[in-house]
């Protein structure tokens, strides 16, 4: 597809369904900096879930950043300065998908790895009238918080490893900390009361687990959730027998969270 005189690409997975099926939710999955849509398709593990849970998965491709020659998303990050109109691209992409596919426009979600997670936060700020909920894995919120004035509260999930050296959990000169990002969204979504904290079991037997922090009493039935994983770095957590082992399977955690929300609140 063409946007702003640039040929843009994406991969799409549409689950097998009867012709008379109801409109399907849509998950946009954004790759990280220096990565690709094809790579994102391979490591996220979304496609089996898209088949079993009946949602459409779309993997957009970022443009090449002129200063580095690497694929990226313009997440309004000072660490990855860009002039690419990726918000406009996503709007055009959503217009095309809703015209050509049977999309439930009340249940469009954005997820991403690293720079793709940063892009998901930007979409929560800029396109809250279209994006029902988001998840960031190893990303953080890089957009200026003073400009994040969406039209509605947006449910947010963050998955992050304590040992992440690329986007540090406790922040850096380039990236805000994960606790600060979660606190912003808890306030933005009008969450009240203390967060609920539970342990994530050490199912791999390596001596490490994690924590789940959830703000549940938020405006319009929204929630804010943080999954913190011990001894995990800048990685997309996967728990698949015979493959890489983590204490959670990110794709399942993400879908279990997202599927409960629409543009009109929680528990769809």
What is each stretch, according to the model?
Residues 164-167, 234-236:
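Acidic catalytic loop of the alpha/beta-hydrolase fold
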Residues 165-177:
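Conserved alpha/beta-hydrolase "acid-adjacent" motif
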Residues 154, 186-268:
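Alpha/beta-hydrolase-fold serine-hydrolase catalytic core, especially in secreted/extracellular enzymes
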Residues 3-17, 21-109, 118-126, 147, ...:
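Serine-hydrolase catalytic machinery in alpha/beta-hydrolase-like enzymes
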């Amino acid at each position: 597809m063409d946007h702003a005189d640039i040929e843009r690409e994406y991969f799409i997975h549409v689950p097998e369904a009867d012709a008379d099926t109801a409109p399907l939710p849509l998950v946009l999955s954004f790759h990280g900096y220096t990565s690709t849509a094809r790579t994102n398709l391979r490591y996220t593990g979304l496609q089996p879930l898209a088949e079993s849970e009946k949602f459409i998965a779309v993997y957009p491709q970022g443009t090449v950043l002129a200063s580095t020659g690497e694929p990226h998303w313009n997440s309004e990050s000072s660490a990855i300065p860009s002039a690419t109109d990726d918000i406009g691209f996503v709007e055009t992409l959503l217009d095309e998908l809703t015209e050509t596919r049977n999309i439930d426009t009340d249940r469009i979600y954005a997820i991403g790895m690293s720079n793709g997670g940063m892009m998901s936060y930007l979409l929560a700020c800029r396109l809250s009238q279209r994006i029902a909920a988001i998840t960031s894995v190893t990303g953080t919120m890089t957009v200026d918080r003073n400009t994040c004035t969406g039209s509605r509260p947006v449910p947010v999930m963050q998955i992050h490893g304590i040992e992440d050296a690329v986007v540090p959990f406790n922040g850096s000169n380039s990236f805000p900390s994960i606790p600060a990002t979660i606190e912003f969204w808890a306030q933005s979504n009008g969450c009240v009361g203390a967060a609920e904290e539970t342990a994530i079991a050490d199912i791999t037997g390596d001596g490490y687990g994690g924590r789940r922090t959830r703000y549940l009493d938020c405006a319009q039935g929204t929630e804010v959730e943080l999954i913190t994983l011990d001894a995990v770095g800048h990685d997309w957590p996967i728990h698949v027998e015979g493959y890489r082992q983590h204490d959670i399977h990110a794709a399942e955690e993400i879908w279990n969270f997202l599927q409960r929300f629409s543009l009109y609140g929680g528990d769809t």
